[in-house]
Amino acid sequence: MRILAVTAEMFPFVKTGGLADATSALPQALERKGADVRTLLPLYRGLTPLVRGRKPVLVANILEQPVSVYYVVSDGHKLLLLEAASLFDRDGHPYGVKGEPFADNDLRFAVLSKVAAEIALGAIDGWQPDVVHVHDWHAALTCVYLADSTPSVASVLTLHNLAFQGQYPLERAGMLGLPSHLCTVDCLEYYDDMSFLKGGLTTASAVTTVSPTYAREILTPEMGMGMHGVLARRRGDLRGIVNGVDHDVWNPATDPYILANFTAATATRRSLNKYALLQALGLAPTQGPVFGVVSRLTWQKGIDLLPHVVPLIIERKGRLIVHGEGDTALEDSLQALAKRYPELVCAHIGYDERLAHMIQAGSDFIIQPSRFEPCGLTQLYALRYGALPIVSRTGGLAETIIDANDAAIEAGVATGFQFEPANEDDLRAALERAISAYNDRELFRRLQTQAMQANFSWDKSAAQYMALFESLVGNSTRETDAVADIRTETFAKIRADRRLAGTPGSPTG
């Protein structure tokens, strides 16, 4: 099976978060199952050496932008690198610079999506995909551009985070080559603007999220981010598939970023990594627990809860290490804590892959206090490295971590600690339970071993994706008649709801 993946970021080429890890590991897992996966990725400034001296496989003018596509195999990945210098050859990260998004992000990612659609329809000689797999709002317009194609092309939209929806002025739709009949509440229109994500949700052949729990949560008004109505009508095409861990990248036995490699059988060697981590960050050595946080520093991630539990951590002779970037106010509050407790708290603003690995290998616990979490990868890495996760009971966190309550401890299945989302008191109670377990060395070693033996391989997830792709391709040449019927029914229900509500562009429609 030939699969075209479309994404704005992919490790090790460009990464701002877990999306890059997922879009890197899944294609390789699918390849191991016999698929031919090629990933369309923008040629950002730092990637230009990859195409130097190569001939493009596609040259075109897309939305009045000259573009070239190069086929490159690098780091085990089959890449289709999209060169559009005026759009992607820039300073900053993929979406903006100095915390501000680029003003033309709608055009940038519309071009990415339009090129993906052209490739899906056979624009590259000798290779045409059976399925297009697009990730998040950046690539969601691919499904919209393919909506009227003949023959139809099967497409799957994976939601890594529903909070990001690609919302732009509707009057820019013409510039993006979007036909007027799709610029309505039936598809793209969203509160008189347009939402790339909503367009993808209504036109994709199937929709996936990165955990079954999150797939259920987003059907509710509380967690659906205004899209719960659209998602409810696609319920039959919506499923959750848990992300996995890339064992080639996240493997404590071979990790080149850490001082002392180890396995579950030699987990006592983690103490060497703990000492090295504290020393590298200028923190005082301790016999107490080290708590690590590797995260975007945002309200969604619950980072605002951390300052409230620092006194408890310090009182118990612990250390807190926070690594990430995000909201300026949260960054400032964490840096203020680090300044107040210079040998006890570290706030490392930014992202460094080596430090992320060191924190997993040297921390005793990893805290993830997210208010909502589609899947989460950090807690899966923590399991692999024996850093017991302390997570909020939501989304993929609830699904992948087994709370160390009395029953789970007795059954020998506990792998971490859970608490109620956005609940400071419950987080404090979870920390108390974790510290108590840490002080019981026999119990703590047992929990570490159970955590490290948890299996979240990408091969399991890839098998579910392959089954989905095969069902879409196998039920018809490209897209099943049933999917087309569901889409028509969805549009009709949306129109009916809009008339009843009397609200143009309702987000639930």
From Swiss-Prot:
Protein name (record): Glycogen synthase 2
Keywords: Glycogen biosynthesis, Glycosyltransferase, Plasmid, Transferase
PANTHER family: ALPHA AMYLASE DOMAIN-CONTAINING PROTEIN, GRANULE-BOUND STARCH SYNTHASE 1, CHLOROPLASTIC/AMYLOPLASTIC
GO molecular function: alpha-1,4-glucan glucosyltransferase (ADP-glucose donor) activity; alpha-1,4-glucan glucosyltransferase (UDP-glucose donor) activity
NCBIfam families according to UniProt: glgA (TIGR02095), PRK00654.1-2 (NF001899)
Primary gene name: glgA2
Family assignment from sequence similarity: Belongs to the glycosyltransferase 1 family. Bacterial/plant glycogen synthase subfamily.
A GO biological process held by the record: glycogen biosynthetic process
Catalytically driven reaction(s): [(1->4)-alpha-D-glucosyl](n) + ADP-alpha-D-glucose = [(1->4)-alpha-D-glucosyl](n+1) + ADP + H(+)
SUPFAM superfamilies: UDP-Glycosyltransferase/glycogen phosphorylase
Keyword Transferase belongs to the record: yes
Lineage: Bacteria, Pseudomonadati, Pseudomonadota, Alphaproteobacteria, Hyphomicrobiales
Binding-site list for ADP-alpha-D-glucose: 15
EC number(s) per entry: 2.4.1.21
Described function: Synthesizes alpha-1,4-glucan chains using ADP-glucose.
Disulfide bridge map: none
Organism: Agrobacterium fabrum (strain C58 / ATCC 33970) (Agrobacterium tumefaciens (strain C58))
Presence of keyword Nucleotide-binding: no
InterPro entries: Glyco_trans_1, GS/SS, Starch_synth_cat_dom
Pathway: Glycan biosynthesis; glycogen biosynthesis
HAMAP family: Glycogen_synth
GO CC terms, sorted: cytosol
One Pfam family recorded for the sequence: Glyco_transf_5
